[in-house]
Amino acid sequence: MQLILLEKVANLGNLGDKVNVKAGYGRNYLLPYGKATAATAANVAAFEERRAELEKLAADKKASAETRAAQLAELEVTITATAGDEGKLFGSIGTHDIADALTASGVEVAKSEVRLPNGTIRNVGEFDVAVHLHSDVEATVRVVVVAA
């Protein structure tokens, strides 16, 4: 299935690229989420007319993400949780908790943007957490977990 990408897609291509993908990936993900359109002659012509508008929109999204990344780089978030004597938490700190703490401190972050590669935080201490704001922009935030 041949498609034209309407935005940058990780491991696939950039805005305006013609790509060949498996039919299921195109029908179930790229087309419904508005990330691509079928590469027909009419759609190619329509895309070329809208290219400047789409490129400006993509540049605005990236600039917004870079601004948020600069704000996050200066930020250190403290989360209080109940813990046992040895520093092991009763429960865990997940992406939702970190996103809520970052939003409360003034920077809007969705839980899907927070990356915890080793799973949830289950101990008291300081952790560096990656926040994936855009396909090209990633920030690191220091999260301090203290016992209540």
Curated annotation (Swiss-Prot):
Record keywords, A-Z: Ribonucleoprotein, Ribosomal protein, RNA-binding, rRNA-binding
Disulfide bridges in this chain = none
Q: Name one GO molecular function term.
A: rRNA binding
Matching InterPro entries: Ribosomal_bL9, Ribosomal_bL9/RNase_H1_N, Ribosomal_bL9_bac/chp, Ribosomal_bL9_C, Ribosomal_bL9_C_sf, Ribosomal_bL9_N, Ribosomal_bL9_N_sf
Keyword Transferase belongs to the record: no
Q: Which GO terms describe its biological process?
A: translation
Q: Which SUPFAM superfamilies match?
A: L9 N-domain-like, Ribosomal protein L9 C-domain
Q: Which GO terms describe its cellular component?
A: ribonucleoprotein complex; ribosome
- Pfam families, alphabetized: Ribosomal_L9_C, Ribosomal_L9_N
Task: Report the function annotation for this chain.
Answer: Binds to the 23S rRNA.
User: To which protein family does this belong?
Assistant: Belongs to the bacterial ribosomal protein bL9 family.
Specify the protein name. Answer: Large ribosomal subunit protein bL9
